[in-house]
Amino acid sequence: MTFPNFRQHDSKDCGPSSLRIISYYYGKHISLQRLRELCHINREGVSMLGISDAAEAIGFRTSGVKITWQQLRDEVNLPCIIHWKQNHFVVVYKISHSKGKYWIWVSDPAIGLIKYCEKDFLSAWLSSTDNFDITKIKNNSQGIPIAKLLSEVMSGINNTHGIALMLEPTPKFYEEKGDDEKKFGFGYILGYLRPYKSFIVQILL
């Protein structure tokens, strides 16, 4: 089955479009307009924090982190949203290994489905910031201005990490009806089973 891809309407829609792609992968059709509103999109676009807030509003559990290539490759449950080329968001949905090389499969709202070799992927994903932790921003109980807090969170220089937003659907995600969909259709059932696909494969084997 081909991994979903939705094209962004303009350059500011990459974040909401990436979330729309993952929602559809898990069986839920949500309109771009609704996600744009939940992401608090503005003339500059959207932040990772805005995408995280929107994802949690529709029933995902999220974790925004700075991770190494090895962590993304070996530990992260895909698909996830990553910060791309410092000004864009895309979905990583598969990492494969063939003939001694790693290949990263991306659903990009700007250009569609594309496969990258490790070198090209890392050159676009690894950033010059370190110590990114979205929970520090969310738990800002002292009322520190967001611009200042972001500056503190994104401080440091390290080209070994990239930003990723990991998403896990909760029961709330499946309980809420999406836009223009039949809740109990095949897509809904398939999406509900996706988080457990590894266990299903083990049972079938």
Say what each PLM segment does.
Residues 1-9, 16-205:
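Membrane-integrated ABC transporters
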